[in-house]
């Protein structure tokens, strides 16, 4: 049944510039009716009071065990100072190992060391040295690769260059193929070589067909190696971990959680490097606890638990965890705390539209945020809605106050504009959901890609990141280039696949899975399969765009790809934001609770 509306609302929507068919692989359908570029809706307030409450559909979500966990924690500042002193003393020794010698073999060794630094969580200590090594080595690739027949070495060199945005041809792996055109079976017993090739294969683009073959080849054989018991136990565990989360798609801060214990059990590990990694990681853990004491105190003072109905996700610590995907180094507490506050604004906005607000309330909130001030109808709305609106507006006022002295007011203004856009997307989906409407898949994705908050999240990251965002950075984001469009689509589909059962359990049918099932007449499992194919293709496009995008600063491209890594961790077979009790809880425990031993 179609929803009926009364007074009118007009909201702006930006048309996507990257055609959907280029990602989805099937032709766009022509639809008649109202254009999505300029929706005019009529609203009515016929339902009031108890009648309004009786039709709400929402699941009460459990209170998080983390919200008050860190209030009583005490961090010893003198311990942190001692760790910094030890790190400062060891850093020159490690730097000397990286940069001391010259020549092709030495360049090759330095590039191999980059993989170790990233894996141990130490890359941020040596960014200049890493960039210099790769810049100098890029012109020597052919010489380095000439006659190199070690699979592990070739794979890691390939991985290092592509990881940092340098294009190197995947043809370097043709030397490992036999006369039959397949990868040589003799490679299958070389566990570390196979593991390195597996990691490298995840950096493939749409044209790297050999890497698609490599991924298939290594995946099956690594599973066998890990299961058969021929590998050392610590290597088998490591293989199982990377099969679940390849390093390329992992949050950078989570990689050393698993790799440091693995490296410690390697017979040829470097004691200085291992000690440096442990000291660095422990300092990070202490800094995170300090941050969490601040953000959870801020969150407690908002009093959401007593002021709002229990429809929202009580996820302040989860918000902070996801911030670490893009800002994890110890000196950036200020930026992490601000971004956590921003993520909280996005989360309460999404929950209000998605899980609780009636249509008249959704219209009033959308109009108020479009005006960036309460509209006339807001006075007639429930108190909870006024609290949500006031929280968002006041939080941005604080951002403005903090950043204006630094000459960064434009970042707040640009972020507000993206916040308005995601509000529009939330409203559009809420309108469909209230009407129990399942649109065409393409129509849904056009709206859903904005609603999923990728662009608004990136705007907040730009606002908070250390390398001050420029107006050009925001213009790039606003133009919705292929990089951004693809990331939006990937996030939308992963969210809808992993959250499908939750959506259906609360009567929320406006979902990519339902849209695809309806349009193409397929089953749920068939829809999952087809949508996952789109996601696999999207991963290749993201790699391609990271390597080929020009005129955009590397820090902006890296932040964008780090967001892709956050999305991978959030939806890796589960919906990790709404239900962080499983794997996400394990990750948070490893970072915030289980202190690394020295």
Swiss-Prot record:
Involved in terpene biosynthesis in roots. Possesses sesquiterpene (C15) synthase activity and diterpene (C20) synthase activity in vitro. A motif (DDXXD motif) lies at residues 350-354. It holds the Pfam family Terpene_synth_C. Binds 3 Mg(2+) or Mn(2+) ions per subunit. Keywords: Cytoplasm, Lyase, Magnesium, Manganese, Metal-binding. Predominantly expressed in roots but also in stems, leaves and flowers. Mg(2+) 1 binds at residues 350, 354. The keyword Ribonucleoprotein does not apply. Its EC number is 4.2.3.-. Pathway: Secondary metabolite biosynthesis; terpenoid biosynthesis. The lineage of its organism: Eukaryota, Viridiplantae, Streptophyta, Embryophyta, Tracheophyta. This is Terpenoid synthase 26.
């Amino acid at each position: 049944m179609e929803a009926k509306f009364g007074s009118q609302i007009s909201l702006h929507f930006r048309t996507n510039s990257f055609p959907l068919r280029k990602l989805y692989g099937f032709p766009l359908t022509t639809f008649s009716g109202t254009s999505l570029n300029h929706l005019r809706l009529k609203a009515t307030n016929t339902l009031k009071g108890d009648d309004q409450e009786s039709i709400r559909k929402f699941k009460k979500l459990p209170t998080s065990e983390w919200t008050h966990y860190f209030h009583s924690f005490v961090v010893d500042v003198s311990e942190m100072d001692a760790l910094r002193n030890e790190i400062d003393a060891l850093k020159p020794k490690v730097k000397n190992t990286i940069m001391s010698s010259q020549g092709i073999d030495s360049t090759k060794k330095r590039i191999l060391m980059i993989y170790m630094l990233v894996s141990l969580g130490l890359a941020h200590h040596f960014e200049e040295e890493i960039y210099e090594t790769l810049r100098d080595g890029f012109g020597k690739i052919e010489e380095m690769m000439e006659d190199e027949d070690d699979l592990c070495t070739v794979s890691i060199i390939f991985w290092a260059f592509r990881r940092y945005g340098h294009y190197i041809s995947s043809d370097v792996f043709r030397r490992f193929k036999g006369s039959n055109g397949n990868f040589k079976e003799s490679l299958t017993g070389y566990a570390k070589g196979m593991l390195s090739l597996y990691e490298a294969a995840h950096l493939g683009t749409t044209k790297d067909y050999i890497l698609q073959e490599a991924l298939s080849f290594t995946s099956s054989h690594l599973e066998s190696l890990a299961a058969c018991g021929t590998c050392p136990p610590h290597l088998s565990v490591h293989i199982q971990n990377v099969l679940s989360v390849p390093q390329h798609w992992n949050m950078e801060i989570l990689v050393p959680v698993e790799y440091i214990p693995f490296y410690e059990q390697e017979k040829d590990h470097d004691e200085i490097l291992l000690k440096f990694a442990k000291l660095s990681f422990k300092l990070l853990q202490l800094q995170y606890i300090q941050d969490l004491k601040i953000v959870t105190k801020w969150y407690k003072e908002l009093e959401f638990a007593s002021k709002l109905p229990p429809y929202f996700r009580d996820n302040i610590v989860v918000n902070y965890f996801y911030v670490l995907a893009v800002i994890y180094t110890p000196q950036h507490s200020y930026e992490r705390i601000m971004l956590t506050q921003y993520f909280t604004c996005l989360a309460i906005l999404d929950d209000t539209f998605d899980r609780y607000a009636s249509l008249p309330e959704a219209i009033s909130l959308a109009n108020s945020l479009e005006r960036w001030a309460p509209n006339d109808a807001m006075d007639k709305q429930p108190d909870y809605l006024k609290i949500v609106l006031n929280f968002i507006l006041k939080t941005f006022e604080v951002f403005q106050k903090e950043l204006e002295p630094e000459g960064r007011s434009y970042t707040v203004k640009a972020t507000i504009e993206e916040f308005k856009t995601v509000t529009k997307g939330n409203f559009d989906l809420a309108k469909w959901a209230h009407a129990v409407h399942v649109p065409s898949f393409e129509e849904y994705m056009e709206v859903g890609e904005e609603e999923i908050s990728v662009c608004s999240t990136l705007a907040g990251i730009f606002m908070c990141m250390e390398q001050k965002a420029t107006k050009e950075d925001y213009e790039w984001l606003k133009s919705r280039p292929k990089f951004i469009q693809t990331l939006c689509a990937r996030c939308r589909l992963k969210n809808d696949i992993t959250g499908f059962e939750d959506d259906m359990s609360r009567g929320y049918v406006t979902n990519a899975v339902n849209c695809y099932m309806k349009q193409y007449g397929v089953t749920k499992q068939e829809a999952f399969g087809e949508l996952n194919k789109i996601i696999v293709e999207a991963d290749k496009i993201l790699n391609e765009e990271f390597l080929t995008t020009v005129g955009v600063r590397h820090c902006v491209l890296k932040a964008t790809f780090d967001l892709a890594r956050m999305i991978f961790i959030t939806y890796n077979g589960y919906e990790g934001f709404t239900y962080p009790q499983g794997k996400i809880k394990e990750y948070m425990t490893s970072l915030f609770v289980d202190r690394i031993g020295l």
